[in-house]
Amino acid sequence: MIDHLKRTKIIATCGPALTKSLVSLKMLDDNEYAAIKKVAYANIEAIIKSGVSVIRLNFSHGTHEEQQVRIKIVRDVAKAMNIPVSIMLDTNGPEIRIVETKKEGLKITKDSEVIINTMSKMIASDNQFAVSDASGKYNMVNDVNIGQKILVDDGKLTLVVTRVDKQHNQVICVAKNDHTVFTKKRLNLPNAQYSIPFLSEKDLKDIDFGLSQGIDYIAASFVNTVADIKQLRDYLKLKNASGVKIIAKIESNHALNNIDKIIKASDGIMVARGDLGLEIPYYQVPYWQRYMIKACRFFNKRSITATQMLDSLEKNIQPTRAEVTDVYFAVDRGNDATMLSGETASGLYPLNAVAVMQKIDKQSETFFDYQYNVNYYLKNSTANKSRFWHNVVLPLTKKTVPKRKLVNSAFKYDFIVYPTNNINRIYALSNARLAAAVIILTNNKRVYTGHGVDYGIFCYLIDKNPNQLTKAELIELAWKAINHYQAYGDLEKLKQCLAVYNETIINL
């Protein structure tokens, strides 16, 4: 039996599979939708109970009111459960999509000529279709060259450019395979320098809306340079929202060329393997995933692995063995969080997908090489320069190392309780990959919901400034928090617990 609180975080994308047909706030108060509302609330409660700590909202789809409904449901449920849940806004970003096709789509045959209209709103027909970005102002003819590949619908259709007609705003291509394309399907231009602005008008409106709703994270699509991060940070500062964390989505070869700088400039990265696998050879993706996770550990940043982790669970109950291995080794490599996209947004079995991911994450934590973690990562991480690291984090890491890495019962401690509002110290505790869950006592609501991505961190809201607690108050609150998370994690029997008071480790 695996009896410990899962420390790897799960990010679940919220969509109709979870919140059903609820698309307006009025529907929540309408008795006609009472049954649907009950199911939606039950779904969110179930996935939080199964270990979801971040709800991702994909702003490539849905209206603001639809997303507001989802935020309200999540906040209502999280408050009732007394469990912090972070909200992540995923930007639309600079992407190109097919404008419109007929219901049956547009069938493209191998070796046929395909004409892409770059400044038109035409409905696709006769081997022609139109493309646009979110603003409707982007002209793709400026970003392509003869001989270049264009990938459509996640690479399911490959086109090669044979001619660029700037006068008529057309890109003429030859199809390399058969495929049927549909409305809103994405286009990728591998290795192209896109002339689309990093933050479109739509992105800024979405971000403004998200800030009004108190989001915790922005997953910024198609980050290519440090300048992209700076542009977004400056905008957040202008909006008095510097506390919102930026997760850079790595989706292009240009981003990989700047990867260390991007990691250092952001609060964390998302290995967005879908688009990345189209922009670079797919067989290079595992290497870069490992590199980015390792670099995030080194720079004390958060890492998320995303895209098709349990893709088959959109339609099936059982995951493929390859998917199980994928999730397992993402955690084993040192990921902070594993993410579900279509599995929970539009899949048939969203609750099952979360439950499956929870089991795999916990299993990987059980066999994680904690001794290697001490010997290597703690010596190489940039976080080891701080006094707190040497006085608290390193001793805790050594103290909690299991005696035998392959035996779950060798976990000696269940919880470590630390009172703080210091984000950098929370990051240090998370990055250490302690063999116990860390409960942060905080009176800051931004801190309370702001660490849903951080490995091993569980926040507990208190009334008093955590830095002003007496030792007796700390011990009393520590046990309240421990009992709360013991119940949340369905832990039958507590092992030993620790607390940190004035940088001194004490047994509870």
Curated annotation (Swiss-Prot):
The gene is pyk. Its cofactor is Mg(2+); K(+). Belongs to the pyruvate kinase family. It comes from Mycoplasma genitalium (strain ATCC 33530 / DSM 19775 / NCTC 10195 / G37) (Mycoplasmoides genitalium). This is Pyruvate kinase. Disulfide bonds: none annotated. GO terms for molecular function: ATP binding; kinase activity; magnesium ion binding; potassium ion binding; pyruvate kinase activity. It comes from the Bacteria. Mg(2+) binds at E251, D275. ATP binds at N58, F59, S60, H61, R97, K185. PROSITE patterns: PYRUVATE_KINASE (PS00110). GO terms for biological process: glycolytic process.
